[in-house]
């Protein structure tokens, strides 16, 4: 095995670990969401996340927390609060695989928001593919059927929140340290969550607290896995593997919750996946042309 192939496989391995962690997050969130209110889950998740990040803050020094954009951190925290509470609640009423397929639609929302907030010019082919992707989202959510539950739209609200986070990250992350982005967002989300969570408070058991700690730690763990992966392979090289998360989620949901993806979820995935892949690769080409022209 040559060095290039070894580096590629190692990078993909790190990326797959991020997918496993992401699926585990959804499974834990679903389990906890059936026992605790989503506001309380959000509070503990980001409270523990801020605790886990403290050693990194001490290691890198207090200068890593210096920021000239406190409003950005507050906005990220509010979006995280809204997105995570909506996502957790959605998981309590829909299968994990449905959540996974909806998460594939986030690049579609990001593309649309980028037009308004980043002044990006989008070629007509990407608009067509975006429309196709949203058709896949509609197929997944089944609003045209008798058994449609409107509360499943909380997933869509969460996806829009996460897309807004992507926009903010694209605009500001290069101007702020990663530690400060993570730490301040966790603090803000925990602070915002606490007053609302106190209205629905149920004291978690020892096992639930342990799961909440793991849930709070895993966000940083996923980021670590992704950074390791992207240090070895290009982000577009990992794109096809992103959709293995559906397989991982389906296996976990089957054994833990006895869930199995329905036909609508699978049909929606078949439509959304090619659409988002096209967007990812076309964005890569656009960035390459931009760099070549500079």
UniProtKB/Swiss-Prot annotation:
Keyword set, alphabetical order: Amino-acid transport, Cell inner membrane, Cell membrane, Membrane, Repeat, Transmembrane, Transmembrane helix, Transport
One Pfam family linked to the record: EamA
Annotated ranges, domain EamA: 21-141, 160-280
Full protein name: S-adenosylmethionine uptake transporter
Highest taxon in the source lineage: Bacteria
Compartment annotation: Cell inner membrane
KW Zinc (keyword) present: no
Function in brief: Transports S-adenosylmethionine.
Transmembrane stretches, start-end: 4-24, 39-59, 74-91, 98-118, 121-141, 148-168, 177-197, 207-227, 237-257, 260-280
Annotated disulfide bonds: none
Membrane topology: Multi-pass membrane protein
GO BP terms in the entry: amino acid transport
